[in-house]
Regions:
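A structural signal for conserved, well-ordered secondary-structure elements
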Residues: 1-317
Length: 317
């Protein structure tokens, strides 16, 4: 499906040298902030107190969120749970206070603001459990990256595989770098968004590389740069449709999803935008710098008749 077709190929690779330098600087900056500032982990990773409060009416989340903040709990997560009358409050660990003391103080303040509020459940998430979640999250990220690397190694010639893997890491590190620089809260939903970004990034690179391989067979007189420019130009319409729809969904969650989905949607917006950029100016550019050529993708087909009038005779992918 295409919204439009561009008749003349756009010279994307003409801008690759400058944009590759910018990408390298962004990547180095992201790594620097990850090591110096680190990620601002949520209580799911660091531990804390989880309270479930029931109201006989729809709860005012903004008012509920303000109550623990007035008590000195800065990084509080408040969200509706199941229905508008049930609220989940996540409190970070506080020096000198037990989980029971935390929940007691907050509940007393909530009932002072609304006597009908009732504590339905309280739970303590210890630092050890949070550490296990962080470890499991890193394992999930490593498994996804490993699976993508294996798929690319089997699916493409090694130069394309290296280019796609570098583009994947570029996107993930820069997303994490944004969260480290601005100290946005990194939670389990944000980790899920990072894993989704990995999928979007490799998908876009694979689409372009498939078209590059097809164009090598189709245009024998084209140079490598011309083949790559043509492949990217031919896939622009598809990119606009798929990523435009996904970004529209992510922006909807960002604008209307409330605090619970805020950083999840933000990670998706940054990651998907970076995947569009990196598939063109990182993955395709690296394939160009590695000097991918027709001979890397096409090989002689044994026993096949060769037609001298067929420019692709004897070549198979």
């Amino acid at each position: 499906m295409e919204f439009f077709r561009i008749q003349r190929d756009i010279p994307f690779m003409r801008f690759a040298p400058v944009l590759n330098v910018i990408s390298a600087l962004l990547f180095v900056a992201a790594v620097f902030f990850l090591f110096t500032r680190g990620l601002h982990l949520s209580i799911e990773f660091t531990g804390g107190t989880v309270m479930e409060v029931h109201y006989p009416h729809a709860a005012d989340l903004a008012a509920v969120r303000e109550v623990p903040r007035r008590l000195g709990y800065g990084d509080v997560q408040v969200q509706a749970f199941g229905n508008p009358r049930d609220v989940v409050i996540r409190l970070p660990l506080h020096a000198g206070e037990s989980s029971t003391m935390q929940s007691g103080r907050v509940m007393a303040a909530l009932q002072a603001a609304d006597p009908q509020a009732k504590l339905a459940r309280t739970e303590f998430v210890g630092p050890q459990v949070g550490s296990e979640l962080a470890t499991d999250g890193l394992k999930a990220l490593a498994f996804v990256i490993g699976g993508i690397m294996l798929y690319l190694a089997l699916r493409f010639e090694w130069k394309f595989s290296v280019a796609a893997i570098v583009a994947n890491l570029h996107d993930v590190i820069i997303v994490l770098g944004f969260f480290a620089f601005f100290q946005w809260e990194f939670s389990l939903p944000v980790l899920a968004a990072v894993l989704a970004v990995l999928g979007y990034s490799v998908n876009e690179s694979v689409v372009i590389f498939d078209r590059v391989r097809e164009n090598f067979r189709k245009y024998r007189k084209y140079t490598t740069v011309q083949v790559i420019d043509s492949a990217i130009t031919n896939t622009i319409s598809r990119t606009i449709i798929t990523h435009g729809a996904t970004l529209a969904m992510a922006f909807s969650m960002f604008l209307f999803g409330g605090p619970a989905l805020h950083y999840f949607a933000l990670a998706l917006i940054i990651g998907i935008s970076m995947s569009i950029y990196s598939s063109v100016f990182v993955a395709a550019a690296i394939a160009m710098w590695l000097r991918v050529k027709r001979e890397d993708l096409l090989k002689s087909g044994p026993g096949r008749p060769k037609n001298p009038n067929d420019p692709n005779a004897g070549a198979v992918v």
